[in-house]
């Protein structure tokens, strides 16, 4: 009801905690101001709560109040007002609004009672088909259902959502969508149900709604390219919630973001999304298809887009990709990896992926470094990976074992000898010249 509180940041992230290390880096690359315009106010709340572990708590409390004061979460908003004003009393305006909210809830419940009971009757539901017009005719003729009753489900669902009752909202909007032929309201209900599933952390259902929203954008807005661009931008941002919280969503959404329509949207409207796409691709290295052509294609596509969009957007995550695969600068890649870790730990969506990113990035640095050098100094490579010599030695042993490269470790000399196939000329090229002319060829080799 009105006392509901939006889900916490902890509930919507995969167990990662906010850290206050290197605040200057994290704050410099904070994307919250860019994300907020593309999110519903209820979806913004967990991001603000996450920031409360990093920023001035009093400012965050005030921001929460400004965010939610126009919703029907009256009890929670009243509590925020008390906290801001250091008061034990609740102003009359909140008491009055609470009474109004309760009265409206009762009104909507009464209006929709008949149709909600019918839709819970298995005998009635068993007679429904995929044809909405036929379903409405059946319900009208057999049970006296009217269009107004169907629309009451929509109004009631929206009101429950405004009260923070996201589970109830999802069910009501689903019931409305089953029966309604009003395309605009059905599209609105789909967005409402998507937000509700996100806020109840029902990721499988959320992904179903992502697909429905995508289909709606393609069909309903077919002749409206500007509308498609705006709606795709919203869908991209909303999809970040399941992207890093639901493993099966990772491949689906990575493919979606790389698809022509959506990568064009990212480049045109929201290039900062490259941070999340880069994090997804890099961490995909640790997943099942890390050696497959799918991963290699993702990496090549990422490198291409990062190179193209460098003038428009960059942060330590995209700069890491650029340093390693465009500039082939291992020292810069090491520097950017350290900064990237701090940015990841300060990002609501990526905090739980920070360790996986660092692990995968070290592997990518190692693999790239080993591919272009014949003799590798263990101490030097360890430094590039941000490890001490003992840790670096263990790392390299594991790398050789896991990737099955042909290499020998000379513990006495502290080196690794790479037995590259004689037909590979790229090592010779990179060791004899650092010219930019050859970097495209090296890139192809590293990403292959």
UniProtKB/Swiss-Prot annotation:
Keyword entries, A-Z: Cytoplasm, Initiation factor, Protein biosynthesis
SUPFAM superfamilies, alphabetized: Winged helix' DNA-binding domain
Superkingdom: Eukaryota
Molecular function GO terms recorded: translation initiation factor activity
InterPro entries for the chain: eIF3e, eIF3e_N, PCI_dom, WH_DNA-bd_sf
Record domain PCI: where: 254-423
One Pfam match: EIF3E_C
A biological process term (GO) from this entry: translational initiation
GO CC entries: eukaryotic 43S preinitiation complex; eukaryotic 48S preinitiation complex; eukaryotic translation initiation factor 3 complex; eukaryotic translation initiation factor 3 complex, eIF3e; nucleus
Subcellular localization(s) per the UniProt record: Cytoplasm
PROSITE patterns recorded: PCI
CDD domains noted in UniProt: eIF3E (cd21378)
Subunit structure: Component of the eukaryotic translation initiation factor 3 (eIF-3) complex.
UniProt similarity note: Belongs to the eIF-3 subunit E family.
Primary role: Component of the eukaryotic translation initiation factor 3 (eIF-3) complex, which is involved in protein synthesis of a specialized repertoire of mRNAs and, together with other initiation factors, stimulates binding of mRNA and methionyl-tRNAi to the 40S ribosome. The eIF-3 complex specifically targets and initiates translation of a subset of mRNAs involved in cell proliferation.
Protein name (database record): Eukaryotic translation initiation factor 3 subunit E
């Amino acid at each position: 009801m009105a006392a509901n509180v939006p889900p916490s940041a902890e509930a919507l992230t995969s167990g990662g905690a906010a850290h206050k290390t290197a605040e200057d880096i994290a704050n410099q690359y904070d994307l919250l101001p860019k994300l907020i315009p593309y999110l519903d106010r209820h979806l913004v709340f967990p991001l603000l709560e996450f920031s409360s572990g990093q920023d001035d708590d009093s400012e965050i409390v005030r921001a929460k109040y400004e965010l939610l004061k126009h919703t029907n979460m009256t009890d929670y908003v009243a509590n925020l007002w008390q906290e801001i004003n250091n008061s034990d009393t609740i102003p009359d305006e909140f008491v009055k609004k609470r009474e109004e909210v309760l009265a409206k809830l009762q009104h909507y419940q009464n209006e929709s009672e008949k149709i909600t009971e019918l839709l819970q009757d298995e005998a009635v539901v068993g007679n429904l088909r995929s044809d909405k017009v036929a379903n409405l005719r059946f319900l009208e003729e057999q049970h006296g259902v009217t269009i107004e009753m169907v629309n009451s489900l929509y109004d009631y669902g929206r009101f429950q959502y405004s009260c923070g009752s996201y589970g109830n909202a999802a069910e009501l909007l689903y019931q409305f969508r089953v029966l309604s032929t009003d395309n605009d309201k059905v599209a609105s209900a789909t967005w409402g149900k998507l937000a509700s599933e996100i806020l109840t952390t029902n990721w499988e259902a959320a992904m179903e709604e992502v697909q429905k929203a995508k289909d709606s954008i393609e069909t309903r807005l077919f002749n409206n390219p500007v509308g498609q661009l705006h709606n795709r931008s919203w869908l991209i941002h909303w999809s970040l919630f399941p992207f890093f919280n639901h493993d099966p969503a990772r491949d689906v959404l990575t493919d979606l973001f790389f698809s022509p329509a959506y990568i064009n949207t990212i480049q045109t409207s929201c290039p900062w999304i490259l941070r999340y796409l880069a994090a997804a691709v890099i961490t995909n290295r640790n997943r099942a298809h890390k050696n497959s052509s799918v991963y290699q294609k993702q990496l090549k596509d990422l490198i291409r887009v990062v190179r193209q969009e460098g003038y428009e957007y960059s942060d330590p995550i995209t700069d890491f990709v650029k340093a390693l695969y465009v500039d082939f600068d291992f020292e810069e890649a090491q520097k950017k990896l350290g900064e990237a870790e701090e940015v990841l730990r300060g990002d609501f969506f990526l905090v739980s992926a920070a360790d996986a990113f660092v692990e995968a990035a070290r592997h990518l640095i190692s693999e790239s470094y080993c591919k272009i050098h014949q003799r590798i100094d263990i101490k030097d490579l360890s430094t590039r990976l941000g490890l001490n010599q003992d840790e670096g030695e263990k790392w390299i042993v594991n790398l050789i074992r896991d990737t099955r490269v042909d290499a020998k470790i000379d513990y006495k000399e502290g080196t690794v000898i790479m037995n590259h196939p004689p037909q590979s000329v790229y090592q010779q090229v990179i060791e004899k010249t650092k010219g930019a002319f050859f970097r495209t060829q090296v890139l192809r080799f590293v990403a292959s």
